[in-house]
Amino acid sequence: MVNDTISDMLTRIRNANMAKNDLVLIPFTHINLEICQILLKEGFIQSFKTLTLDVSKYSKLNAQKNLNIVVKLKYLGRQKNSCITNLLRISKPGNRIYAKHKIPDMLGGLGIIIVSTSAGIMTDREAREQKIGGELLCSVW
């Protein structure tokens, strides 16, 4: 069992990018789903969809369904240059990082910071426009 699902998601995407895989399977949580929506809106991934795997065929103990998110990564050109250069976890379970409404730019506006606010999970630009702060989850560039 994974304690930090956001770090697990970022690591899976980072590893799939380095291996130049087209698809990556991520465990379903609502936070992971919202982060995928932001990455799609900002153009870092091509698409994503939720997938239900029926585990009852393989396990006689429990008839349970396993929810996952399948992310299709985005590459440019013949050499498959990734749209995602790096993914960094900012706020960790042992060290939470919060910011007021004056969130700094990421690489002069080239990257984004994903922020968890009282109005939901959003990018740093949206949080600055709405003048609300929150927990800095991760940065993507």
Swiss-Prot record:
InterPro entries according to UniProt: Ribosomal_uS8, Ribosomal_uS8_CS, Ribosomal_uS8_sf
Any one cellular-component term (Gene Ontology): chloroplast
Subcellular location: Plastid, Chloroplast
Signal peptide range in chain numbering: none
Molecular function (Gene Ontology), one example: rRNA binding
Matches recorded under Pfam families: Ribosomal_S8
Record keywords, A-Z: Chloroplast, Plastid, Ribonucleoprotein, Ribosomal protein, RNA-binding, rRNA-binding
Any GO BP: translation
Subunit structure: Part of the 30S ribosomal subunit.
PANTHER family the record matches: 40S RIBOSOMAL PROTEIN S15A
Family: Belongs to the universal ribosomal protein uS8 family.
Protein's UniProt name: Small ribosomal subunit protein uS8c
Protein species of origin: Pleurastrum terricola
Gene this chain is encoded by: rps8
